Amino acid sequence: MKKRAISALLVIIISFTALSGRLYYISSSADFVSVQPHIRVRELGTKKGTIYDRNGSPLTNTESKTILCAKPTTKNSVLVSSLKGKKFAKSTILKGYFTSFFIEDSKSVTQNDDTRCFEIFERYSDNVALHILGYTDIDGNGVTGIEKYYQNEISKHNGSLSVAYSADALGRMLIGEAVEVRDDNYYSKGGIMLTLDRKIQIITENALKNGKIDKGAAVVLDVESSAILACASTPIYERDNIEKHLDSPDSPFLNRAIESFPVGSVFKPVTAAAALESNITLSEYNCIGYIEKSGNNFKCNKTEGHGNIDFNTAIAMSCNPYFIEYSTQAGAKKLLKTAKALGFGKRIDLGNDFITPSGSLPTTEELNSAAAVGNLGFGQGKLTASPLQIAACFATIANGGIYNEPYLYKGEIDKNGNLTPTIQNDGKRVLSKSTCRTIKNAMAKTTTEGTGTGAYTSLFDSCTKTATAQSGQYDENGVEIKYCWFVGFFPIEKPRYVICILKENGSSGGTDGAPVFKEISENIYINDMN
């Protein structure tokens, strides 16, 4: 009896094992289809919030690729057969799988429920405003520039695009099932708006390239508000090949538009403003080629001297002794007060901790002699500033004496493309209108008769100033590195734009910067006329 029971149990166990094996074989077979469908999700693309210029033109997500999504149908197998280089897709479709791939021209595809095309955005398609926009890491996190400091505002408008469909256990799409498109804010217009003008930015970058400013910068500001319209730096780097540039001696990651450099003669209008605001009359002066202060001789850029010159000629020809003399008359306290009021020695807050270097300005204690004051008076000594700071200073002169801190962020764009603007701080009067008028008249002569004639154009009149600043730094050949500046505004009658150009290790402000100023200003003028 016991043996019979054991035998029966063995028969049951063997039968169950055989049945289990058969079921496993059947379920593993390609002929078996699960009655329970699986939802497959295929991500087509992700997108960060868009960065726009002041006119609503995108600075990111400017270009796109077309991706084709095809269900496994006979018609689609014929379709993909006609597409160059897509043989793999036909094989995929014939096996019953949903497929997607990029194509060059969506016009060649008739779209329907079985075949859909989608535009997939590329974050960066060019290098416009490279240094100010910055770049992101592989995970999309901002590393530098606007991408870093405004990441939270941008990320609020991130989106993704995917498709979902029913498939069997092997991933093959179920016949007759629809494809669900999941648009999670992907085609939203949301993002942020900057004060940059894409057209002016491109004009500025092209001018730097054409002017062979291989290491330098250019800034364009709106005269009335100091809104940053263009901000360019050279050399540039490749966003998709960061490692290549990490050890470059030219420091391509440095945004020279906001970094500080020796200033030189573009400080002379500040000295003039300090004297005029102190009710000192800027009279004629006899330049003999040098001036002595506290036992120190300071040379003029013209060895034999300029002779008797008035203020307009002193600005136009950039006479050093003239401004050394009037800086000592104005005094250290007034000179420093005026410089600070015009933005020297102060950091510029571009929002969200995007703060630029302050540059350097000597203290009152350091200006303890006529020689020290005179040295500052023509832009030398412990004085550095950025192209952005210099541009803001001259915007103040151009608009009649109101200093506005430069700004870059205009506000947030919602998903429908509507702007919620930020409130900008009111400017502050720091110079009288008469002081600005006197300086503007002198700067006009720089363009027509002085060191800035290379910027002259028949299209309009401009006010300009040049500088060639000593650095105390030397290249491998023992030649001192010069920082060459050119700054000005136009048109004279009602100034709208201020432009500041810097070239590192150049020849002179007039030689290097004037042609660049001319190209930028003429193209902006022509653009405004169209």
Task: Give the predicted meaning of each segment.
Residues P58-T60, V179-E180, D222-S265, V270-E504:
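Beta-lactam-recognizing serine transpeptidase/beta-lactamase-like catalytic domain environment
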Residues M1-E243, S283, K333-A341, L502, ...:
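Periplasmic/cell-envelope proteins involved in peptidoglycan metabolism and beta-lactam response
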